[in-house]
């Protein structure tokens, strides 16, 4: 109306309109283009608020956000009739609206609002209402918002959907595991043609991921879930027995924490069970020492993954340790008696495990008093010269072999004396 007085408002200015309060959030003075100069108003009533953004473009939205402007509101009147150049994702996140109103004429439905804007709103779970369908009415009463209008749903975000898998726990099998998928959004099953599936970390033991991405036809956004892959059943591959030592090797797996080995003289592992833990996936063999000789043992191994679980025990194998390598009984082969010495010679031990010999001599036939013991630590040396001591003429002697596992039996006792 001509002659009507007017003035430009400034940031922070507010005035009352009945029960509502109108506040200037942005006065438009910082803009350099017509749209950037759009005034942004917040209307507050009944404890709820509506943000009116005019034709404010994303360029100015971002500038104002960077300067700390507060655009928080319950309802957003989408900028520039839903043009793609307005209502950027960062701006929508800053407003945090529950509802959005898009004002555009019925004649422009083919052009506005843009699909990109509708997708951005859907990704933030904002309910959209459009004036192209019907005049939009919102009631702000006592801190509650109501509307007789129906939501205009073109895109639905699947982020908060529920993914059902054929199973949540699998065992590794050396190849990718791809459980079947079902997606439910807002209580309805979504057709598999509406999203694509991507599996990751789904081969080796650990936590595998499933990511569904809407194909932007009706559904947008992503929805994720996980499932567990336990280690596979282990296999003992190599085994070696040497005396009372047993060396085992197993197949091994990738991406496990390590392995458990159990062994026992009980086939059922109900008693006398011992365990070894290997906290390295590359530790694929071990040697168990100090076992009983000539004894059967049972072995099984399994992999484990910390915070995930254990694999199945391998097939039990049995191995028997070798017999105790007892040196043969000592036997003198030659005794040469001289005045000041006596040369002793005995049969050599033949076992590769034998370490040497022990000779004892004493004037006491029962070897209880004045016993002297000589240890020879070379199995190849099978002789010894016994030297005469003052006032000692006769000796009783005996010899035996020994190794690191045990001693042989003493030879028959021989009586020797120094020649006159």
Residue spans of the language-model regions?
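Non-globular, low-confidence helical/coil segments that flank catalytic cores
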Residues: 1-155
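Serine/threonine-rich, repeat-prone extracellular segments and beta-strand-based repeat modules
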Residues: 189-220
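Solvent-exposed, low-complexity, repeat-rich "mucin-like" stalks and linkers
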Residues: 155-188
